[in-house]
Amino acid sequence: MSSENSRNKSRPAVHAAEIVREYGPFGSATQVHGVTHDGRRVWAATGAKLVAFDPASGETSQTLDVPCDAGTAFDGKHIYQIAESRIDKIDPATGKVLASIPAPGNGYDSGLTWAEGSLWVGQYRDRKIHQVDPETGAVVRTIESNRFVTGVTWVDGELWHGTWEAEESDIRRIDPKTGAVLERLEMPRGAGVSGLESDGADLFYAGGGSSGKVRAVRRPTTGRQH
């Protein structure tokens, strides 16, 4: 194989992101900092309130008054929410904080997701994704990225994360062992990603930062693991 072919083979597949739908803004909220999906509803972290909405109707079904200035995750029973330098474990029925652990970035964390019994925490400017013990906050391992990390999600064994630098933003699939970029979905210019979660099927939900919106983005079918 020639070096040119080798270079082409290693380049990630790049697609224009297909935005299926936009939701929000939500009430008086002007920001979306984190997003998760509980199997039925999408949750958006808007700074002082977690807002749950039905992705079919777009209607808000619940709000929780909790600090929520970065990533959000759901483990099947509880919500995990970054609040400054900590990660709170929250009862979604009541909003009660059941436990807290230190966030690895000490206030500079962004994305958050749950997979394989661990929390996965994005560190924005450090361009890192940490696997974190949800009981203690200890960092189990770290994956390096080459872009600012603004959201993290796992789906079907694939690790995806959002990026946002200046007016450019994308959703990218990376190799969880090496951090190599395997695939990129380029968002329209100015449509930043602040929080990312998969619905476990065909869609990503991406926070839209200061737009106050959440965008549903089609997950590509190419390259999926079976």
Regions found by a protein language model. Give the residues of each.
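Blade-level signature of beta-propeller repeat domains, shared across WD40, Kelch, NHL, RCC1
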Residues: V193-H226
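A short helix->beta-strand "capping" segment at the edge of beta-propeller domains
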Residues: R7-A29
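Conserved beta-strand positions in repeat-built beta-propeller and related beta-rich domains
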Residues: V42-A48, I79-S85, V121-D126, H161-A166, ...
